[in-house]
């Protein structure tokens, strides 16, 4: 059954610049495949309903990256939105737990360099893995366990995943310290793959080491 769509109705908000001077632009659509009412954003939106959208059915990121959230006020499951088209909810959700995306904000990239420390236990104790300017699709394959209970993001912005191959729930780590897994809203200290969130102009190959 084909649903008849009317031409998109457009709204624009924001000034087009992030806090660090970078440009951010994203278009959210109420229906799948870039149909229905739409809204162009260049700044955070705590509730898509404020822009007269009942939901988000598809997304086009012109410049970013952005971070989407399952619930209003930047709560719930997180979804990293990098430059490109997302025609359906399952194109931005790696866990496929929920088709809801109700708030979003620009994701700041503080540096072209990336360094992160993963710790086995809370409080930065136990085994440690350092990753520098690299993506790791499987912590197990590189000699580390799947238990990550605290994190130090020293440079750059990272996203950790519940399962290998960048699958499952996503958890974003902006530069800072995360003493306990509840500080990144995880239900348990489980992380099996990690990658950088990068500006498209940066393509560096890096390294990792365990201790």
UniProtKB/Swiss-Prot annotation:
Q: Name one GO molecular function term.
A: structural constituent of eye lens
Domain Beta/gamma crystallin 'Greek key' as annotated: residue spans = 24-63, 64-108, 114-155, 156-198
Q: Where is this region: C-terminal arm?
A: 200-211
Gene3D superfamilies named in the record:
Crystallins (2.60.20.10)
Chain spans, region N-terminal arm: 1-23
Keyword Repressor listed: no
Protein name according to UniProt: Beta-crystallin B3
* The encoding gene: CRYBB3
């Amino acid at each position: 059954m084909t649903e008849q769509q009317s031409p998109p109705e457009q709204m624009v908000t924001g000034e087009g610049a992030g806090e660090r001077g970078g440009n951010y632009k994203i278009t959210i659509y109420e229906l799948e495949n870039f149909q229905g009412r739409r809204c162009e954003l260049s700044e955070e939106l705590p509730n898509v309903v404020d822009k007269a959208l009942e939901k988000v059915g598809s997304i086009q990121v012109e410049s970013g990256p952005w971070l989407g959230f399952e619930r209003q006020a930047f709560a719930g499951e997180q979804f990293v939105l990098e430059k490109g088209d997302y025609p359906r909810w399952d194109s931005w959700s790696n866990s496929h737990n929920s088709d809801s995306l109700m708030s979003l904000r620009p994701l700041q990239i503080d540096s072209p360099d990336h360094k992160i420390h993963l710790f086995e236990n809370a409080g930065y104790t136990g085994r440690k893995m350092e990753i520098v300017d690299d993506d790791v699709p499987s912590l197990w394959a590189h000699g580390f366990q799947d238990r990550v209970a605290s994190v130090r993001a020293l440079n750059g912005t990272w996203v950790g995943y519940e399962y290998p191959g960048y699958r499952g729930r996503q958890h974003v780590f902006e530069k800072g310290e995360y003493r306990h897994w509840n500080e990144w809203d995880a239900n348990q200290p489980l992380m099996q793959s990690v990658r950088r969130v990068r500006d498209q102009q940066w393509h560096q190959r890096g390294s990792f080491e365990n201790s």
